[in-house]
């Protein structure tokens, strides 16, 4: 009976431990910050392409 409180405390500590990322990082691993930067830069690039040739996208190469 004396071991039960210790056992419960250990279970609570194990459950509150931070999780570990199981998947290994690969070569094309992108962080959230780089994805946010990419999302911000893409509309800027598209707006520059639109401004270079309003009639046709063929001349924007």
Curated annotation (Swiss-Prot):
Contains 2 disulfide bonds that can be either 'C1-C3, C2-C4' or 'C1-C4, C2-C3', since these disulfide connectivities have been observed for conotoxins with cysteine framework V (for examples, see AC P0DQQ7 and AC P81755). The keyword Phosphoprotein does not apply. Expressed by the venom duct. The cysteine framework is V (CC-CC). This is Conotoxin Vn5.3. Its main location: secreted. It comes from the Eukaryota. Residues 1-19 form the signal peptide. One of its GO terms (molecular function) is toxin activity. It comes from Conus ventricosus (Mediterranean cone).
